[in-house]
Swiss-Prot record:
Principal cellular location given in the protein's record: cytoplasm
Cofactor: Mg(2+)
PANTHER family linked: DEVELOPMENTALLY REGULATED GTP-BINDING PROTEIN-RELATED, MITOCHONDRIAL RIBOSOME-ASSOCIATED GTPASE 2
GO molecular function: GTP binding; GTPase activity; magnesium ion binding
Domain OBG-type G: 160-327
Residues engaged in binding GTP: 166-173, 191-195, 212-215, 279-282, 308-310
Compartments in which it is found: Cytoplasm
Protein name in UniProt: GTPase Obg
Gene name of the encoded protein: obg
GO CC terms, sorted: cytoplasm
InterPro entries: G_OBG (IPR031167), GTP-bd (IPR006073), GTP-bd_Obg/CgtA (IPR014100), GTP1-OBG_CS (IPR006074), GTP1_OBG_dom (IPR006169), GTP1_OBG_dom_sf (IPR036726), OBG_GTPase (IPR045086), P-loop_NTPase (IPR027417)
Quaternary organization: Monomer.
EC class of the enzyme, as a word: hydrolase
Length: 343
């Protein structure tokens, strides 16, 4: 499935149905009064976070959504039915912005959350409402009120517990494939991963979600390479797993490059808990391994974990380190109650 993390959409709720002009007509009742019913309310436009989605690709092919108009009122005081609603289904982690792409309307972070984007117009009054002492047979009814319309931006920030960061070819996709059922594209050239990928890792009977982010290079925050566009997908993570390839000539410099890009991006990424690992250590002999570890330790101020997704060395230790941070963060997270939401 193709990946799309931003889309512009036009939505319009349904107009209200028109009220009816009608009079009671029955045998032996010569002067039946007005009995025109009210129009039905127009359909609403809802946004709902659903399970099983991790892209906004559907909104590349359809950008206009309109709820149905309410049914018109009828005689015998029959009110028209409400117009059918429209529900836009999006992945959890989707933010909705106004047309300026800056003003946040809502943020759907949990599967099952629903938000009312546009409320349907009210139905018009039938002529029964206009009967007075001086006008016993009003021939007047109201049209329904128009629905609301707006242009919105949908922006997806994937929800994962841990985010993989590092330079291209640091072994992020290989690690993701080794510890989850995900099947990312893996090859020996830069930017093999062009879009974020998700996988579920399991350790000690507990599970967490890992996001593989396309590699960063120096100047990514200025648009170099494929830029820092996808860094938004690690904003919601609880911990970063920073992989530095053992094949780097200068692991310390590689580490500092990625940290500088995280800092330049902002939004608190540089402050997130970071697990540091020297990956692809199976490609080194003992002497080379010591030198690379020393270089990385000098740059980071702490010793890295050693990891090889190919041989399995250090994989369980890294997963346990990630799970420890994630479990603590989950315990501290308090549920947030939003009064604007309807379910």
């Amino acid at each position: 499935m193709k990946f799309l993390d931003q889309a512009k959409v036009y939505v319009r709720s349904g107009d209200g149905g028109a009220g009816s002009v009608s009079f009671r007509r029955e045998k032996f009742i010569e002067f039946g009064g007005p009995d025109g019913g009210d129009g039905g309310r127009g359909g609403d436009v809802w946004l709902e976070a659903v399970d099983g989605l991790n892209t906004l690709i559907d909104y590349r092919y359809q950008q206009h959504f309109k709820a149905k108009t309410g049914v018109h009122g009828m005689g015998r005081n029959m009110t028209g039915a409400k117009g059918a609603d429209v529900t836009l289904k999006v992945p959890a982690g989707t933010q909705v912005f106004e047309e300026d792409n800056e003003t946040l309307i809502c943020d759907l972070t949990v599967v099952g959350q629903r938000f009312l984007l546009a409320k349907g117009g009210n139905g018009g009054f039938g002529n029964q409402h206009f009967k007075t002492s001086t006008n016993q047979a009003p021939r007047r009814a109201n049209p329904g009120l128009p629905g609301e319309e707006l242009n919105i931006w949908l922006r997806l920030k994937l929800i994962a517990d841990a985010g993989l960061v590092g330079l291209p070819n640091a072994g992020k996709s290989t690690f993701l494939a080794a510890v989850t059922a995900a099947k990312p594209k893996i090859a020996d050239y830069p930017f093999t991963t062009l879009h974020p990928g998700l996988g579920v890792a399991r350790i000690d009977a507990r599970e967490f979600v890992i996001a593989d982010i396309p590699g960063l290079i120096e100047g990514a925050h200025e648009g170099v390479g494929i830029g820092d566009r996808f860094l938004g997908h690690v904003e919601r993570t609880r911990v970063l797993l920073h992989l530095v390839s053992a094949q780097e000539e200068n692991p310390g410099k590689a580490y500092k490059t990625v940290r500088a890009e995280l800092d330049a991006y902002g939004n608190g990424l540089i402050e997130k808990v970071e697990i540091l690992a020297l990956s692809q250590v199976d490609t080194l002999d003992a002497d080379a391994r010591r030198k690379k570890v020393a270089s990385l330790k000098r740059a980071a101020g702490r010793a890295p974990m050693l990891l090889s997704a190919v041989t399995g060395e250090g994989v369980e230790a890294v997963l346990r380190a990630l799970m420890t941070v994630i479990a603590e963060a989950r315990a501290e997270a308090a549920p947030v109650v939003e009064t604007r939401w309807e379910k």
